UniProtKB/Swiss-Prot annotation:
The keyword Transferase applies. One of its GO terms (cellular component) is cytoplasm. Its EC number is 2.3.2.6. GO terms for biological process: protein catabolic process. This is Leucyl/phenylalanyl-tRNA--protein transferase. Belongs to the L/F-transferase family. SUPFAM superfamilies: Acyl-CoA N-acyltransferases (Nat) (SSF55729). It is found in: Cytoplasm. The lineage of its organism: Bacteria, Pseudomonadati, Pseudomonadota, Alphaproteobacteria, Hyphomicrobiales. GO terms for molecular function: leucyl-tRNA--protein transferase activity. It comes from Sinorhizobium fredii (strain NBRC 101917 / NGR234).
Length: 204
């Protein structure tokens, strides 16, 4: 992980929102580490909403509607799913403080979840923060084939419909790059962020 970081003894929800507005976000070294630190990557992951790409195979699967997609009905359960170890991800950075902070942002109307349901079981989802015309994606999880990918597609559809300008993925992965995510230098990201944050808070 490239980018500056500094220890922060106590982070409040309001402080967290201010941090997002200037390009910072918190992480922990592990789920068991009680400390948080601010991260400000020199290279930022961004998923351009006008260049979002869905593969033919995924589009075909989405048309079959394998899951019911809901928004903001099980926010804390989504964080819990993201915090659990998974194949290829033996540990995560989501500690108890992260859960508490983002649950507070959710109650304040700033943090949101996209959820994939199979009957009454949550089988995938993602969560993030909405501020101005920007959405900051935090994490995702999947217990069924393509569940988190389908949630991402529905997230982008929703952001486009509501005229969001920026989808920040923090970092890029090969998974996100397959959808069109790109690495953006900090100076360019700062301009994109300032433009999006200058907008009134858009309804998610």
């Amino acid at each position: 992980m490239k980018g500056s970081r500094s220890k922060q003894p106590e982070i409040t929800p309001d402080m967290l929102l201010r941090a997002y507005s200037i390009g910072l976000f918190p992480m922990a070294d592990s789920a068991n580490d009680p400390e948080l630190f601010w991260v400000e990557p020199e290279i930022r992951g961004v998923l351009p909403l006008d260049r979002f790409h869905v593969s033919h195979s995924l589009a075909k699967r989405i048309r079959k509607r394998p899951y019911e997609i809901r928004f903001d009905t099980a926010f804390e359960a989504v964080i819990e799913g993201c915090a659990k170890p998974a194949p290829g991800r033996p540990t995560t950075w989501i500690n108890d403080k992260i859960r508490s902070l983002y649950a507070a942002l959710h109650r304040m109307g700033y943090a949101h979840s996209v959820e994939a349901w199979e009957g009454d079981r949550l089988v995938g989802g993602l969560y993030g923060v909405s501020l101005g015309a920007a959405f900051f994606g935090e994490s995702m999880f999947s217990l069924r084939t393509d569940a988190s990918k389908i949630c991402l597609v529905h997230l982008v559809e929703r952001l486009r419909a509501r005229h969001f300008q920026l989808l920040d993925t923090q970092f890029t992965t090969e998974h996100l790059k397959s959808f069109g995510a790109v690495d953006v230098p900090k100076a360019e990201y700062d301009l994109l962020l300032a433009r999006a944050i200058a907008s009134p808070n858009l309804e998610f």
